Amino acid sequence: NKWTSATAYIAKRKSIDVIAFRGTESGLDVLTDINVIPVPYAGRLCHGGFVLQHASIWQQILEHLDPRKRTLFTGHSLGGALAELSAAKTWKQHKNINLVCWGKPNCFFKGFKQPMDLDYQISCVNGSDEVARRPRLLYGPSSSQTMLYFANNGTNVVDPGKLFRKVDRGGLKDRITDHKMAGYTERLEQYLEERKVAAKKVTDLRKKDKDDLETIADELEAS
């Protein structure tokens, strides 16, 4: 949208449509981020600036939604907030809605953070990323989200407690640099590689257990 600078990209596949929202980029986007007045939207109170951006392109996005297919809403920073608002607008009418956000700011007014029944709802947070912690006074994340936290010590934690995140938090420089998408990409690749290695270990253990059982069976049969 040329007035709000809101931008979305749509990739259509055979069984899933991916709708990705662009994050903060222009001066208008910054004004959006600081407009924290709550307004009613999607059956709850939401961050007014995010709602303004989302509403400016939502009708265009609706034209591309196919209820017969899975839909993944995703985005980084401001784009993550717009993706979350999209899920809030559609989950009651459409099945198979999925949400993955990166460094997403809080957009639901506290007290109006009703859970959403999505296929999956993941919010990725990279270490000290300050944007993913704000605005804090009036707003919070959806109560049904799963947080994948890329800790500063190199570990990956699912739904860490507030104390853990507070202790893990770095200095001012880290709070800025950890918000960059490049950092998220690096940590995601690391996480997926660790999952791949872990899956191989499980497969190897199962194969070893099977081989051990077959050896025992052969010995019993021969005795």
Residue positions per predicted region:
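Non-catalytic, mobile gating and regulatory segments of ester bond hydrolases
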Residues: N1-T74, L78-S223
